[in-house]
Amino acid sequence: MRIYNCSYCGRPIPPGYGIMYVRVDGVVLRFCSRRCFVSMVKMGKNPQKQAWVRKIRRAKSAAQSKSSSK
């Protein structure tokens, strides 16, 4: 089983969860929640400008740096 990352916030998506959206040009976007899906597809928001996305990405990078330093 493969674990994908959310195209909007970067969270891991466990198998059997999330939304897979295929654009007309063939690009596959995977979302962990409806919140991410609506923010990107329906409202066209930029994830870099969303405070909650920045918070998730910072926590993810901090966890990765701790695990790589061991």
Swiss-Prot record:
Keywords: Metal-binding, Ribonucleoprotein, Ribosomal protein, RNA-binding, rRNA-binding, Zinc, Zinc-finger. GO terms for cellular component: ribonucleoprotein complex; ribosome. Binds 1 zinc ion per subunit. Pfam families: Ribosomal_L24e. Transmembrane segments: none annotated. The keyword Disulfide bond does not apply. One of its GO terms (molecular function) is structural constituent of ribosome. A zinc finger (C4-type) spans 6-36. GO terms for biological process: translation. Binds to the 23S rRNA. Belongs to the eukaryotic ribosomal protein eL24 family. This is Large ribosomal subunit protein eL24. It comes from Caldivirga maquilingensis (strain ATCC 700844 / DSM 13496 / JCM 10307 / IC-167). The gene is rpl24e.
